[in-house]
A protein has these predicted regions:
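C-terminal structural segments of small proteins and small subunits
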Residues: 66-91
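Short S/T/G/P-rich N-terminal loop/turn motif that feeds into the first structured element of a domain
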Residues: 1-55, 61-71, 94-96
Length: 96
């Protein structure tokens, strides 16, 4: 099995308090499932048609681990706490 990289791009954040509460739950839930956080924050530089918005880069040991992490009860609870306070996009790619 190859590693998987997950890129999360935030398009809009409407409530910073809910985002902070989400992060307190989401980080440990994802780490428990095997996630390694590689980068998080606002890009220092964007090119072409890029938008400087909050971005997270995560490494997973496998597709299965990424799926199980997202679908875990603890991560789903984090999503409930987020309560729509962020519009974001998740992308998953197999490592080379």
């Amino acid at each position: 099995m190859s590693k998987v990289y997950q890129v999360v791009v935030y398009h809009e954040i409407s409530n910073q308090e809910k985002l902070a509460a989400y992060a307190e739950l989401a980080g440990p839930a994802m780490k428990k499932a095997g996630a390694i956080f590689l980068a998080r924050g606002i890009p220092y530089l964007v090119r072409e048609d890029g938008v400087a918005s909050r971005t997270v880069l995560i490494e997973w040991p496998s597709r299965q681990a990424a799926d199980e992490g997202y679908n875990s009860a603890s991560y789903q609870e984090a999503i409930r706490v987020l309560d729509g306070a962020a519009k974001r996009e998740f992308r998953y790619m197999d490592a080379l």
